[in-house]
C-alpha cells in the first residue's frame, strides 16, 4: 500500500480527512509513483514472487482517469483497479480497501469519518457493488455484512445471479489462498489446555513488554 501511491496529497494534506482527499500530479508524473509496485512489489525475488495483497489509498487521483473522466476514490475507480491494477499489471492477489470508505461521509470537511470520496451520492450498498465490480475483494474496517448482502442482490438484478456468484467466489478464492499459504488449514487443531497455558501467560507478556520498551524512540 498505497495504490497508486500515497505521496501526492494536494498541499501535503492528509487523506484521512475530506480536506485531503485529492492526489494531484501537476508535473504529469503519475507513472513514477507506480514504480514501487510495478518494479518491486509485483516482481519480488524468491518464491514469494509478488505481493499477496494491495490496498488502494483513500485519495481521488485527480485527472488520472482519461478513459472514463471520473474523479473518485481509488477503490471506486474502474480505471485504476480494473484497467490498470487487474488488467495492465495482471495483479491476481487480494485488493483490500483502505479503512472505512463505504459509509456515508462526515458533515464537515474536517470530520474524521468515512472517506467515500467522489461517490457520496450513492448508497453504501451501491458503493460496495462498484468496488466489487472493479475488482476489490475485501473492505477494510467494515464489520457489518448487510451492505455486502444488499450489494450482491443489486448486482444479481444488474448483472445476473450467475455472474455475481462467480465474482464473489473469485474473491473468496483469493482470500482462502492466503490462508492456505499460512498453513492454517494443514494443522487447524488446537489443544485447549495447552492454549490456556501459553496465551497471555506471564512469560510472554513480560517479553512483549520488554520488546515494546526497546522499540520506543525518544525525540
Where are these regions (language model features)?
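Glycoside hydrolase catalytic-domain context in secreted enzymes
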Residues: 1-219
Amino acid at each position: 500500500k498505497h495504490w497508486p501511491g500515497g505521496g501526492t496529497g494536494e498541499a501535503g494534506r492528509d487523506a484521512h480527512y475530506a480536506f485531503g482527499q485529492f492526489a494531484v500530479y501537476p508535473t504529469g508524473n503519475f507513472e513514477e509513483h507506480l514504480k514501487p509496485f510495478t518494479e518491486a512489489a509485483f516482481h519480488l525475488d524468491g518464491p514469494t514472487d509478488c505481493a499477496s495483497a494491495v490496498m488502494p489509498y483513500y485519495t481521488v487521483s485527480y485527472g488520472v482517469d482519461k478513459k472514463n473522466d471520473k474523479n473518485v476514490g481509488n477503490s471506486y475507480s474502474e480505471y485504476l483497479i480494473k484497467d490498470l491494477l487487474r488488467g495492465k499489471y495482471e495483479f491476481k492477489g487480494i485488493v483490500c480497501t483502505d479503512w472505512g470508505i463505504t459509509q456515508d461521509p462526515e458533515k464537515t470537511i474536517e470530520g474524521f469519518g468515512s472517506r467515500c470520496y467522489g461517490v457520496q451520492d450513492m448508497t453504501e450498498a451501491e458503493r460496495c457493488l462498484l468496488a466489487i465490480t472493479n475488482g476489490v475483494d475485501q473492505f477494510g474496517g467494515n464489520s457489518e455484512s448487510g451492505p455486502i448482502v444488499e450489494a450482491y442482490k443489486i448486482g444479481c438484478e444488474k448483472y445476473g445471479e450467475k455472474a455475481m456468484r462467480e465474482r464473489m467466489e473469485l474473491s473468496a478464492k483469493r482470500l482462502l489462498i492466503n490462508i492456505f499459504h499460512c498453513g492454517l488449514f494443514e494443522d487447524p487443531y488446537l489443544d485447549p489446555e495447552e492454549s490456556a497455558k501459553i496465551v497471555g501467560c506471564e512469560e510472554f507478556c513480560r517479553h512483549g513488554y520488554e520488546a515494546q520498551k526497546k522499540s520506543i524512540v525518544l525525540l
